[in-house]
A protein has these predicted regions:
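Acidic, polar-rich low-complexity tracts and alpha-helical solenoid repeat scaffolds
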Residues: 2-7, 14, 18-226
Length: 226
């Protein structure tokens, strides 16, 4: 009986210690957060200063806190745009694209929607990864080709929805570059299959060029493979 009581008392003591430790840890985290009492104005100002100084990770932290604490505040929309930009510049295109998509779903008629689409397309191509250097050489991989198709869809959406946007001329130029790069990629893949006697796959790739990129110089190359 006494042993059972001692075990019970020990269990209660351990539970109390664990609870106290967790509470202290939580309090320490709260006390270490210098932003805990910041207003929306203060959070946005600090986030924007971090952004302007290219301190991307710090900006992301402040924008995240601003969005979570003041989701319907005066800075909510602008903070989402700038947070997407911070993710993109910080080399995190997946997060940037996700942030752009979330913004476009929430505010489809926002005046800055054209800019967000433009940023999404650039993030999709992940320019920091050297995509456009490879594009200039027309030397893109299958992974690049998929990114190019996704970006092409976004650029096209931009010029269709916002033909007079300040970003439309650049989007059109990028569309032309992407079309040429994709057509060249398909021809290269078709030749690869043809050399290895995989004729069905080669014809399928060549047919894609003829169907989807008939106005490019690579149409003649595709016809030769056919």
């Amino acid at each position: 009986m006494k042993k059972a009581l001692r075990r019970t008392a020990l269990g209660i003591s351990m539970a109390a210690v664990i609870t106290l430790t967790a509470s202290c840890s939580w309090l320490s985290t709260v006390n270490d957060d210098k932003t805990i009492n910041w207003s929306a104005d203060k959070l946005y100002t600090e986030a924007r200063d971090s952004l302007d100084n290219s301190n991307w990770s710090q900006a992301e932290e402040y924008y995240t806190k601003l969005e979570s604490r003041y989701p319907f505040g005066r800075y909510a929309q602008q903070a989402q745009i700038e947070m997407a930009y911070a993710y993109w510049k910080d080399g995190d295109p997946a997060q940037a694209i996700q942030a752009c998509d979330r913004f476009l779903r929430s505010y489809p008629n926002h005046p800055a929607s054209d800019y967000v689409l433009y940023m999404k397309a650039l993030a999709t191509l992940n320019e920091d990864d050297g995509f456009f250097a490879r594009l200039t050489r027309q030397d893109i991989s299958d992974r690049d080709a998929q990114a190019a198709r996704d970006a092409w869809d976004t650029f096209r959406e931009l010029v269709q929805k916002y033909p007079d946007s300040r970003y439309a001329p650049e989007a059109r130029r990028r569309l032309n570059e992407l079309i040429l790069a994709q057509a060249n990629h398909e021809v290269k893949v078709a030749r690869f299959y043809f050399i290895r006697h995989a004729y069905v796959a080669a014809v399928a790739r060549a047919q894609r060029v003829i169907t989807d990129y008939s106005r490019t110089p690579y149409r003649d190359d595709a016809l030769q493979i056919m």
